[in-house]
Amino acid sequence: MRKLLFLATVVYTILLIIRPQEFVPGFEQIPLLQIVLLTAFGLWLFCGDKGVDLPQFKILPLLLVFIWLSLGIGGGWWGGIVSALEKMLPPMLLLVIVSGSVRSLSALKVYSFILIACAATLVYHGHLQVTTGLGWTGEPMIEGRITYSGIFNDPNDMGLLFVLAIGLCILHLRTQQGRFMRLLAWTTLGWLLYGVYLTDSRGTMLATLTVLALEIWARFGKGAVITLGVIAVPVLIAYTRLAELDAEDESAEGRIDAWYEGVQLLTQYPLFGVGWQMFSDHNSLTAHNSMVLAMAELGVLGYTVWLSLVFLSGWMIWRLAYPAGLLPQPYPPRAVTVRKETPAALPSPPEAAILPGFDAAAERLAARSLLFAACGFAVGAFFLSQSYKPMLFLNCGLIAGRYLGMREAGLRVPAYAFGANLPRVLGYALASIVGMWLLVRILL
């Protein structure tokens, strides 16, 4: 059943990114995305260990509740839950099916290959836009920046797909043994970096630099990172919009004004926010910051739930990439005491022998690639509005799948409880609100 789920997840990912149903004649009226997604979710329901004890599966329905409350209390539109479900269920279900299907290292490599190929295809579409003026989707460029159809019509959103693909491409560089495959990985990495350049997205460029810096630091040390910065930053400033990244730039000034408006809205609607996707009713620009958008629209309570998804996913992949006492169980299995993250953490799964052929070093290398890609996404999301978009949930789904895969292999992984960590996340949420307020006060 899991193989069928993996196949359905791959098909859905291709349809979501490449979107042939939107430009291939005869498919426009067929809801292929919805059909494949529901099929994948149905297959997930019949899989064995779904991993529903993970905090992500408790956060998702709770996030929907607070979205509804924000619409009703803050926005005065209780019926908006229908629209919210239509837009939020697909990315949430993407997290679910990815976490259920992309668990083994081999599955991650295949799925990452699909993601990289899809991203490279979008780069080629952008290249056609630059050279001929139009790609096969018929979408035009926006102010000299490449676009695509559907959810990647915005070059900023497309750029964050490239960031994830770059992180996964580096994973293939680190694990491939054949000369041809390594050459292919290097070529693809260069092609994806070309795509980042074509997006001309400053947030994407900073995110890409973050991924590259972390990878270089992990392999060569901080001296190499400093060298990279000395070389790369002046080049980017000279040839991209990074030269305009200051508070006096009109675009940057608009972002800061949007951040200020978001903080002000939070003070006016502190508990439940102004209402999901209602920020634009109060400001001409979107927040251009995922945290500000979530805190303004969902209030402190909903923002804390949203931040729980981000924080616990990040903490989870951090501990997998850089484990403390993360060791394979001896064979035959014996009872051990699992180190817990909090006093009220979930109980550990039944002990199991390590799976045959399990390569702990390769697994941790994969976890580090996902961690670095997630860090890059976080940097980009700080300057872009990604609070409810598919790329956030895809990153969290890959992290959850990595955790479940290593747990199934018999590794002692820390248990994570949403409720036990909620006070900590609430503290982080309040600290981030104060931090954004101080940042805006400094920049204005």
What is each model feature region?
Residues 27-34, 83-84, 150-162, 200-203, ...:
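Membrane-interface micro-motifs in multi-pass membrane enzymes
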Residues 23-25, 73-82, 197-198, 243-251, ...:
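Membrane-interface helix caps and helix-loop-helix hairpins in membrane proteins
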Residues 252-308:
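TM-adjacent membrane-interface loops and short helices in multi-pass inner/ER membrane proteins
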Residues 36-43, 91-99, 160-171, 393-402:
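Hydrophobic cores of alpha-helical transmembrane segments in multi-pass inner/ER membrane proteins
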Residues 67-72, 93, 109-143, 150-218, ...:
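Alpha-helical transmembrane segments of multi-pass inner-membrane proteins
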